[in-house]
C-alpha cells in the first residue's frame, strides 16, 4: 500500500508498492517460514514474498478492504502457500488462531491508504477526484465521513482535525462545516475540499489546503492509530525468535508511534532502581535492525507519493 494523501495528482501512476524490495529483503529470513502481510492491498508485497519462499513457506494476507480481499482470493486460488483474512491487522491474534499458527517469522505492515483506494473516486479518499465523501477502508463499517460530519458537534470536529491532522486552522474548519451543513449536507469530496480551502490560507506551495483535514478525518473514521497500536503489540507477541516486524509509515503520527514502540522494546524493560537484577533481566529481547529507511530517488521519481515513506525494522532476538 503506497499512496498517501500528501500528493494525489499523479494521474499516470501505476500502482507499485513503495520500498518493495527492501521491505521484503528485511522480512524474509527463512524461505520455509511463516509470514504475515498485514496490509495486503493489491498484493505487491505478497507476490514478492511468495517469490522468495520455498515450498514449505506460508504467507497470510490481511486486509479490511473487500476489494483487496477479492485480489487475495484470486492469489490464494493459484498458490496453496497463501491464505487470506478479511479484517484489520488489529485482529492479528484471531487471524493467526484461525490458521493454527502460534508464532510467525515475520510481519509486514504498510500503513495508510493505498493508491487504488485514492484513485477510485467512489471511495471518497481523495480531494483531487470528486466523489461521495466516504473514506471507509471497509465500506461495511459505520459511519462514513459524510455521516460523521453531519452528526458530530463543532468541538469534536475541531479536535479530530487537530489531533490527527495537526491542522492549525481546525477550529475555523469545524465552524465552517457546522455553518454549511445547515444550508445543505456535505456529501462529496469536492464540497469538503472547497470548504476547507476557504477556511485555510494556502501557504504551502505544493500542498493542497485540504491535505491535513482529509488525512485527519480518514484516520479517525478508520481508527487507524488505535488499530496500529493493537496490531504492533499483537505482532511482537507472535514473533518467533529471529522473527522480524517491518513497518512502513507515511506520516509523522504513524512514524512517531512506530518509532517509540520499537525503541522502547529494544531498550528493554524499565526496572525499579535499587533492586538487584540479573543481566538477563536487564537485557531486551528485541533489537532494531538498521536505521530508518526512506524511498530512493528512483522510487520517488516513479511515484512521488513515496517521498514521505519511512521503514523501520524490529527483530526478536534468537535464543
From Swiss-Prot:
One of its GO terms (molecular function) is rRNA (cytosine-N4-)-methyltransferase activity. The keyword NAD does not apply. Gene3D superfamilies: Putative methyltransferase TM0872, insert domain, Vaccinia Virus protein VP39. Keywords: Cytoplasm, Methyltransferase, rRNA processing, S-adenosyl-L-methionine, Transferase. Its EC number is 2.1.1.199. It comes from the Bacteria. It is found in: Cytoplasm. Coiled coil: none annotated. It is an enzyme of class 2 (transferase). SUPFAM superfamilies: Putative methyltransferase TM0872, insert domain, S-adenosyl-L-methionine-dependent methyltransferases. Pfam families: Methyltransf_5. InterPro entries: RsmH (IPR002903), SAM-dep_MeTrfase_MraW_recog (IPR023397), SAM-dependent_MTases_sf (IPR029063). Its main location: cytoplasm. GO terms for biological process: rRNA base methylation. One of its GO terms (cellular component) is cytoplasm. It catalyses: cytidine(1402) in 16S rRNA + S-adenosyl-L-methionine = N(4)-methylcytidine(1402) in 16S rRNA + S-adenosyl-L-homocysteine + H(+). Disulfide bonds: none annotated. S-adenosyl-L-methionine binds at residues 43-45, 63, 89, 110, 117. Transmembrane segments: none annotated. Belongs to the methyltransferase superfamily. RsmH family. Specifically methylates the N4 position of cytidine in position 1402 (C1402) of 16S rRNA. NCBIfam families: 16S rRNA (cytosine(1402)-N(4))-methyltransferase RsmH. This is Ribosomal RNA small subunit methyltransferase H. It comes from Marinobacter nauticus (strain ATCC 700491 / DSM 11845 / VT8) (Marinobacter aquaeolei). The gene is rsmH.
